[in-house]
Amino acid sequence: MRSSRMQSPGTMAVDNFLFGQCILYFLAFLFGFIAVVPLSENSDDFQGKCLLFTEGMWQNENMTMGKQRFIVEEWGPESSCRFITFVGIVSLILSAVQAWRTFFFLCKGHDDSLFHAFLNLLLCLLVVFVVFVAGTISSVGFSAWCDAVTENGAMPSSCEDLQDTDLELGVDNNSFYDQFAIAQFGLWSAWLCWLGLTVLAFLKVYHNHRQQELLDSLVQEKELLLGHPLQRSSYNRNAMI
């Protein structure tokens, strides 16, 4: 009774892989949600305009009063904001589906085949690359916006302080810094989760490949053991004849 309840080392290794993947998928889902929500809010606040890579400068609106106003020379490409939002949504959906699938396998004691484990590795590699690109666009593009509104640090106010100032751009800019700070945190944290999932997927492919090689070697040994008695019996019959 006690021996039947004990798990083999191979089964425990598979359960550890599945448990680690399930945790990372859940975290990737959580961080994807953290990234998508502020990006959607910023899109509504800026009325579809993208502040990433936006070019502009401060100009004197009234020479006598010395009042300055920030003038946008060219808004950033909308495709940049749409891309990082799309990547966040895709990461959110994929991680949710994979988390449910991995949790189901963990509860039922199932495991992926070598082919499905390899497909999962390719999927993780693709998502890692795409999320990395989205995080880079978000970080570099937002840095370009902050350089524009602060004139590369020449302004007395920081980029974070300027979100409390009405830039008179016809948009609601009172939370842009917090929104993109949270979005960048979500994207880069999700990237770290997918990077960890890629490592686990690679280890799982390697583990399944080693198991497949072990099974093949056992089958060959069995065929050899079954083949020797047959050869010996045929040899004895020929000797008797």
Which residue ranges define each predicted feature?
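Physicochemical signature of membrane-embedded alpha-helices that form the seven-helix bundle of GPCRs
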Residues: F17-L30, P77-V97, H116-V133, V149, ...
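Intrinsically disordered terminal tails
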Residues: M1-R69, F104-L114, A154-I241
